[in-house]
């Protein structure tokens, strides 16, 4: 029987075998011929594997192929691990269903439908909670008092309160009855000769209240126009006050049992004396303006001499005080002119002219005082506190600086930042820093030539600008 065999070396052989031969006989023939192992080859025909006990057919092509060497393996384990991971995943929202829609969108639609179904239930629960909260707030707290001692104390306190109120009402009613039965002492009889003296007040600043109160009650309308206190204050504010007579003693020294008529008489005398003093001062000041000017000049010199130790008064305050005194004196003159028996209209006009002249003189003197105070303050300047060494250096600012004549950095500090910077730049040194640093740096090169200067003090050469 004749058949065709393709050997492992790709040779096409025509082989004649016995009719009952099998596939194993074919393999033995080639292994014996080539000297290889029987287990290293297998036979296939028409692309199918032939078994070892199959009979050979005539005219069929058989392929003798060697077996491949086995590897390490492991690819199957890798496939098994990957399959396990694929099976473990639970997020399949990125997948699509049969209609092509994302599972994520489908799930969201289902969740939204369920949420809308439960919306009414949620609103009902919310309203129920709100009503319960309101009921809890409106519910009144229930207090149960079971303390017998506390109840007994409250009962005792109420009884004591009633007793104390009754006693107080009885005491007040008895006091009112006694006050009604006694004589009325609200107003004393002025004709009573046995009038008791008032108790003297020794409070500070309250000494003349009794006399002022009694004088205001007994004074007439004409007397109330000009009071002694205002007239005395007006004259004493602008002019030196003369010695007061014995009638102006302390009201505490006078007997409190003096009659109203005597007090009225004393008040009239005081008013007359004050008017006479004011008119005499006005006439004397108008008759001798030169003397007043001399006194004012002396006062100005005294003020200027003391201006270095104490600040000068403001001219506005002086003018205000002088104008107040003038207004008060003119008011007194006008009030005194109301009585035609003492002054005539001509005298009033003369006094008014004199007052105007005095006002002009006072204004002039105030301007002179202001000028002198300004001059004195200008003379006393902080420049006087500068030491002599610094003043010498300041006088030589514009001159070329000679370091050999400088005794210390303190003198160089007086030159200022700009001058020190200029001197340092001329020597090629660093010109930055504070005033003290610049002065110390400049003083450190005293008596040194440019070659002897420390290189750390020199400025770095400036680099040219790149074009």
UniProtKB/Swiss-Prot annotation:
UniProt feature, compositional bias: Low complexity: 225-237, 252-261
GO terms, molecular function: DNA binding; snoRNA binding
Residue ranges, compositional bias (Basic and acidic residues): 265-278, 353-375
Residues spanned by motif PIP-box: 33-46
Region (Disordered): 173-199, 212-395
Domain SAP: 412-446
Propeptide: 1-71
Coiled coil, from the record: 107-143, 341-381
UniProt-recorded name of the protein: Splicing regulator SDE2
